[in-house]
C-alpha cells in the first residue's frame, strides 16, 4: 500500500451498511423465521481450570437481514442467468452446482447513493419510477460498473417489522433504467428491492419483476435490507463500496456486512 493510499483510507469515514441481526427482525414471508441465535455453551463454575468458554449457534435463512442475492436465486421459466436450465444436474438437495454464491467475487467498486426519499416521504408500497431515480441521480453521476444503492427511507423502520415490510421499492421500469446504466450491482434499504406487495407484472408474468430483470436477464446481483441512513445524513452520494459474500457452496445468497468509505 502506498503512503498516499494509506493516508486517504485512514482519514476517510467508514459507513456500516448492515442492519442489526436480531430475533424478530423483519423477514420476508418466504424466508421466515429469520435470524435466531442460541447460546449452547455457557460460562459456568465447576471446571478444573480458570478458563471458561461460551459459544452459540446461528440459525437463519441465507436471505435474512442484510444480504446479497446470488444469480442462482431466481429463474425465469426454470432458466437461470446465461440460459442455464434448472434441472437435477444444477439444482440439488445441497445447493446449486452453477451460479451459487461461492462463485461471486468480492465487490470493490465505486458506489453511488440515489436518495429517492431525500426530499419526501415515500408512501407504503410506492413503486419508484425511472423519473424518481433520475431526479436522485442529479446529485451524482452513474458510471458503468458502479454499485447503485437506492434509499427508500424505510431502513429507519428496521425495528418496526410490520411497517418495514410495506416499504417502497423499485418498479420494473426502474430496474430497466438501472440495467441501461450497466451497473455492477444494485441494492436498497428494503426487503426485496422490488415492492413486495405489488401485483404480478403483466409483461413478465411475475411478482418481484426486478428479480427477473436484474438477476436472470442482466446478471446483476441485488443487495437487500441495507442501512443507508448515515450515508444519506452525511450526503455521501459517491464512495468506495466493499461487499464480501461468504463462500457457501451452492447457496443462493449470503449474509453480508457491506461498507462505504467516503
Question: Where on the chain are the PLM-derived regions?
Answer:
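Active-/binding-site microenvironments in catalytic and ligand-binding cores
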Residues: 1-262
Amino acid at each position: 500500500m502506498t503512503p498516499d493510499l494509506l493516508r486517504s483510507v485512514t482519514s476517510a469515514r467508514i459507513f456500516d451498511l448492515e442492519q442489526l441481526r436480531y430475533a424478530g427482525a423483519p423477514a420476508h414471508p418466504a424466508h421466515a423465521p429469520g435470524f435466531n441465535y442460541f447460546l449452547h455453551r455457557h460460562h459456568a463454575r465447576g471446571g478444573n481450570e480458570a478458563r471458561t468458554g461460551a459459544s452459540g449457534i446461528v440459525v437463519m435463512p441465507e436471505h435474512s437481514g442484510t444480504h446479497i442475492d446470488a444469480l442462482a436465486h431466481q429463474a425465469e421459466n426454470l432458466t437461470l442467468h446465461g440460459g442455464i436450465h434448472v434441472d437435477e444436474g444444477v439444482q440439488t438437495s445441497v445447493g446449486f452446482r452453477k451460479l451459487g454464491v461461492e462463485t461471486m467475487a468480492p465487490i470493490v467498486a465505486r458506489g453511488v447513493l440515489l436518495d429517492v426519499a431525500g426530499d419526501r416521504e415515500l408512501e407504503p408500497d410506492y413503486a419508484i419510477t425511472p423519473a424518481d431515480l433520475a431526479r436522485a441521480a442529479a446529485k451524482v453521476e452513474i458510471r458503468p460498473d458502479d454499485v447503485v444503492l437506492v434509499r427508500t427511507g424505510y431502513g429507519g423502520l428496521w425495528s418496526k417489522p410490520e411497517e418495514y415490510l410495506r416499504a417502497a421499492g423499485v418498479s420494473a421500469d426502474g430496474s430497466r433504467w438501472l440495467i441501461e446504466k450497466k451497473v455492477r450491482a444494485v441494492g436498497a434499504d428494503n426487503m426485496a428491492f422490488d415492492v413486495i406487495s405489488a401485483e404480478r407484472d403483466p409483461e413478465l408474468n411475475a411478482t418481484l419483476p426486478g428479480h427477473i430483470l436484474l438477476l436472470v436477464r442482466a446478471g446483476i446481483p441485488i443487495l437487500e435490507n441495507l442501512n443507508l441512513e448515515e450515508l444519506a445524513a452525511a450526503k455521501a452520494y459517491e464512495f468506495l463500496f466493499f461487499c464480501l459474500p461468504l463462500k457457501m457452496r451452492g447457496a443462493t445468497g449470503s449474509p453480508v456486512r457491506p461498507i462505504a468509505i467516503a
